From Swiss-Prot:
Reaction catalysed by this enzyme: L-homoserine + ATP = O-phospho-L-homoserine + ADP + H(+)
Organism of provenance: Rhodopseudomonas palustris (strain BisA53)
Annotated family: Belongs to the pseudomonas-type ThrB family.
Enzyme class: transferase
This enzyme's EC code(s): 2.7.1.39
Xref: Pfam families: APH
Gene, per the UniProt record: thrB
Name of the protein in its database record: Homoserine kinase
Length: 326
């Protein structure tokens, strides 16, 4: 979450007249995250999140995201639900951006996930993948391997000034992944951005998954690989095998990874690291002046990419290929 687009109080008040969510008491921007503009609204009826969709989110994709949240919730996945306006619509326009109001989920995201929370997010991800099996809409992943070349072109000029040799690393890895990317693994609905700041907990109990603007149809194990990157490294950049084992075992309890998925996981983890390295690099080069946003460090994912390049098999993530559950 972040704030790229400023919203005047009068404009917000007029926008909210179309919704039956009570009288606006206060609102504030949410600086965390990197993609869309978000505000926390406090009204006489409770708390809500207002999201203005920016850059990478196309208006025509919103029905997919919003319908998916309703679908997942109907199957027991805890996630936000959009508020309809008085005309029965869930998407409006505010400050020239598509805008949606969703209900507020209780909980906080873990700044430093513990082992129990890693296991919990593994279980929740498997549950989401299973719940999405009969979701009727389809959205291809615009940020999968073929889309990374366009990101590379945008980011290449800023690579070596950030770290000598980074441009060559990116190009070589792109070339390798483009040729080696698996084509016959199980696919379905994936979150594609399930970082700790998109998962809420109350204590160690997971209370909800949020932020679905990157959700799409792609390789299910790629979603697992994204989480390995996001949840299983420490602040000193070391890989935490205990957390990885807990996460993978948690996932496997709900949806056991097939042998081919296990074999492909190191490659998928490289791809996930490269994807976020590229988007972070692009974002760091294109922060709007005055935006209330903290660009995230691209080099964090360069380090993760190099780690995954050294991985030989899923055993290096702390589990045996004969069975993920200990």
């Amino acid at each position: 979450m972040a704030v790229y687009t400023d919203v005047a109080a009068d404009d917000l008040a007029e926008f909210l007249l179309a919704y039956d969510i009570g009288e606006l008491l206060s609102y504030k921007g949410i600086a965390e995250g990197v993609e869309n503009t978000n505000f926390l609204l406090h009204t006489s009826r409770g708390s809500f999140i207002l999201t203005l969709y920016e850059k990478r989110v196309a208006a025509e994709d919103l029905p997919y995201f919003l319908s998916l949240m309703a679908h997942l919730a109907s199957r027991g996945v805890s996630c936000p639900q959009p508020e309809k306006n008085r005309d029965g619509e869930i998407c409006g326009t505010l400050s020239g951006r598509p805008a949606v109001i969703i209900n507020f989920l209780e909980g906080v995201w873990p700044r430093r996930p513990n082992v129990a929370q890693c296991a919990g997010v593994g279980e929740a991800l498997a549950k989401m993948h299973l719940a999405g099996r009969d979701f009727p809409l389809v959205r291809k992943n615009p940020l999968s391997v073929k889309g990374w070349w366009a990101l590379f072109e945008q980011a290449a000029s800023g690579a070596d000034p950030l770290q000598h040799g980074l441009r060559a690393l990116l190009h070589a890895e792109l070339d390798h992944l483009d040729h080696a990317w698996p084509k016959h693994l199980p696919e379905g609905v994936i979150h594609a951005d399930l970082f700790p700041d998109n998962v809420f907990f109350i204590g160690d109990k997971l209370s909800g998954l949020i932020d679905f603007p990157f959700a799409c149809n792609d390789i299910l194990a790629y979603d697992v690989a994204i989480c390995l990157n996001a949840w299983c490294f420490e602040p000193d950049h070391s890989f935490n095998v205990t957390k990885a084992r807990a996460f993978l075992n948690g996932y496997n309890r709900g949806r056991p990874l097939e042998a081919a998925e296990q074999d492909a996981l190191p490659l998928l983890a490289r791809g996930a690291a490269l994807r976020f390295l590229l988007t972070r690099l692009v974002d760091s080069l294109n922060v709007p002046a005055g935006a209330l946003v903290r660009p995230k460090d691209p080099l964090e994912y360069a380090r993760k990419l190099r780690f995954h390049q050294s991985v030989n098999s899923i055993r290096d993530y702390g589990v045996e290929t004969s069975g993920l559950v200990a």
